[in-house]
Amino acid sequence: CLSYGGYHAVYIPTEADDSVKEYLRMRNDHKLALKKIKQQINAFCIRHGFCYDGTKWTLAHLKWLKKLEITNELYRETLDEYMGSYEEQEAKIERYDKRIKEIAEQTKYQDKVKKLECFLGIKTHTALSLIVETGDFKRFAKGNQYASYLGLAPGENSSSDSIHRLGITKAGNSHLRQLLIEASGGICKGAVGHKSKELRARQNGNKAEVIAYADKANTRLRSRYYKFIRHGKKRNVAVAAIARELACFVWGMMTDNIEMKAA
């Protein structure tokens, strides 16, 4: 029974949390649709011999796309329709992100979101997703259990005399797993110990011990990534490993175990 620790309580999300979760997932679906449209525009240009040398999806690139000299009217109309869909999706996502910021400022979420935003790679959308999708972080006894819940723990193929390590299990909450992998991709850039103005602004207003814990995590994760790369690990393998450790640090932050090392 529960009183003797024989069973663990099952977390049941509130209707409020579930509604926020659905809104966030809807936003993610539109983000995927935007990615698909970008791929379609790129493919169209390649098929018809239009190559852009600079960084794509900047203002300069968008201006280039709109001013392409295309003599075939139907080709031009096709690209214009693609560009219209692109701009429509961009406007939607901008509107959704504004609404997500408003939700994150609600009393029940604000403090937790501010804490999670102290980590490199975690901004409002990711922070709020972690909170409402996970619910009660304390149902996980350790950080590595939380990483397993997200499918970020390494698998293994064991026999009586050997253990063969595998990649991450990918068994668990795929939405949060993808968000943390994307966040880790942001961590794995830049100098170890560097704090941008944007990160300092996000950390502003938090307690000193919260910022110190996040700084420790940021430094460790970035250092670990570069160590993996120096030792010949593939980038995607290294990023997945960093995502696992980031999940452990997130668990520590949300359960007030901020003196603990990542599991």
Q: What are the roles of these predicted feature ranges?
A:
Residues 223-263:
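Basic, amphipathic alpha-helical segments enriched in Lys/Arg and hydrophobic/aromatic residues
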Residues 114-118, 124, 129-231:
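Phosphate-backbone recognition surface of nucleic-acid-processing proteins
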Residues 5-9, 37-38, 93, 135-139, ...:
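Short helix-capping/linker segments at secondary-structure and domain boundaries
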Residues 1-43, 193:
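Extended, highly charged alpha-helical segments
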Residues 24-115, 203-207:
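Glycine-rich, often acidic, oxyanion-interacting loops/wings at catalytic, nucleic-acid
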Residues 30, 89, 180, 232, ...:
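A residue-level signal for conserved active-site and pocket-lining positions in enzyme catalytic cores
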Residues 56-66, 138, 188, 215, ...:
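HhH-family (HhH-GPD) DNA N-glycosylase catalytic core used in base-excision repair
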Residues 1-14, 21-22, 61-68, 162-171, ...:
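Short alpha-helix plus adjacent loop in nuclease-associated cores
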